[in-house]
């Protein structure tokens, strides 16, 4: 038992180092995102003053092309602030800070995954990225390409990838997983308890996880299909990648709650795009 604990402690050193590096990169991505939107020329002939209602997002509604003082930069700052607040909350709680939680892995060879949200976020973000890369590598070997939807402007695309996690996590995790889980496993019916379980399904007494796992897999596949189902969507190669990502996000939601799944999703979008755009601007 003692030898086993020493092995876990030894493995804990590279493990905590990896999570610490990812945490640092996520932290730095916040100012990088601000630079990309407000200081770079990624938008070409438009910039952060572009009216929000001119986005194709509002096409077909009464808001489309309506005169407004709200710009894409204003909306981005609201999203940025929202994610920054959640990031801070995740780094300091719910019980211990990020680095204090990691220190227990090195000191005692064990990790209490519920002590800090950021530990779970960085761990599952690593897993999600690794699986996505593997799927992409395998599919390319069979000639299956993963082509993103075409957008004429990178600034608008950056705004969309920042907004998408909030919309998709609300729809696919809160509504399609959270509510059915409550219906399956809840022993109470109070509104307060419902909201607590929706926010963090671990509050439910999930005595038989088979139904929960099947639900997560089903919604994950649905999530993958949603990425290729429309005319301006990703190519078919995105289906497997998005389905795997949807299943992982569903598991993160079940185990850690909505904040964790939202931030993992945000990181895969905002984090990757901000660094890629920043590097391209430097090279340019």
Where are these regions (language model features)?
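Hydrophobic transmembrane alpha-helices
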Residues: 13-20, 122-123, 233-237, 241-242
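Juxtamembrane helix-loop-helix connectors linking adjacent transmembrane helices
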Residues: 43-47, 62-73, 93-171, 175-206
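N-terminal, membrane-interfacial amphipathic/helix-forming hydrophobic leader that caps
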Residues: 1-118, 273-284
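Alpha-helical transmembrane segments and their membrane-interface junctions
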Residues: 34, 125-147, 217-235
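Transmembrane helix-loop-helix hairpins at the membrane interface
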Residues: 151-284
